């Protein structure tokens, strides 16, 4: 019998969905979802990692980093607040202007950094004062939070990011495969 055992399992990716199994920039995701992206830097600082930051991020005490707070808009709505920490030795000469365009584009295409892998944890957390200040949360009192440790081809963790998403715009899509034991 022709075609026996073949099923089409493709489902189109939902609007405003982000992928789990790949590293995709905010701009790339917006483009894939046919939405207009904008990023605004609301805080930018150069810091030296202390004990508190090391415990939170995994960077070494004494590392020089950039710390940014970036607000991501989709179709004019503020939906994601990112707390980004970048190792200065990798993200050399990072500026607000670059951060409002695409940090990954700058790293890959200007600095030649090969971004290889990201370890992510997804949680739901109570909103903070800064979430409430910058994101129109309506009746929501919590945020979907994606925490990432991202590594380059030398195995160096160059980025720690906490990405805080409005719950009504949070959708991550993945395809899972069962492995035999």
Q: Where do the language-model regions lie?
A:
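Acidic/polar active-site rim loop that often engages polyanionic ligands
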Residues: 35, 81-89
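HTH-adjacent hinge/linker in prokaryotic transcriptional regulators
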Residues: 1-61, 91-96, 100-101, 108-116, ...
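Short, charged beta->alpha transition segments
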Residues: 27-28, 72-74
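Residue-level recognition of beta-strand microenvironments
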Residues: 44-46, 71, 149
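A short beta-strand signature within small-molecule sensing/ligand-binding domains used
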Residues: 64-67
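C-terminal regulatory/effector modules of DNA-binding transcriptional regulators
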Residues: 58-61, 74-77, 89-90, 96-97, ...
């Amino acid at each position: 019998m022709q075609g026996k055992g073949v099923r089409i399992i493709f489902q189109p990716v939902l609007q405003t969905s982000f992928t789990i199994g790949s590293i995709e920039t905010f701009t790339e995701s917006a483009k894939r979802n046919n939405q207009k992206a904008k990023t605004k830097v609301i805080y930018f600082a150069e810091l030296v990692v202390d004990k508190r930051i090391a415990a939170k991020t995994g960077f070494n005490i004494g590392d020089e980093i950039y710390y940014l707070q970036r607000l991501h808009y989709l179709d004019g709505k503020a939906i994601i607040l990112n707390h980004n920490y970048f190792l200065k030795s990798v993200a050399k000469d990072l500026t607000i202007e670059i951060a409002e365009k695409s940090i990954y584009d700058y790293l890959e295409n200007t600095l030649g950094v090969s971004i290889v892998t990201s370890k992510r944890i997804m949680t739901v957390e109570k909103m903070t004062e800064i979430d409430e200040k910058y994101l129109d949360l309506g009746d929501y009192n919590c945020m979907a939070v994606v925490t990432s440790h991202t590594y380059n081809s030398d195995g160096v963790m160059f980025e720690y990011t906490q990405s805080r998403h409005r719950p009504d715009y949070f959708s991550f899509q993945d395809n899972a495969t069962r492995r035999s034991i």
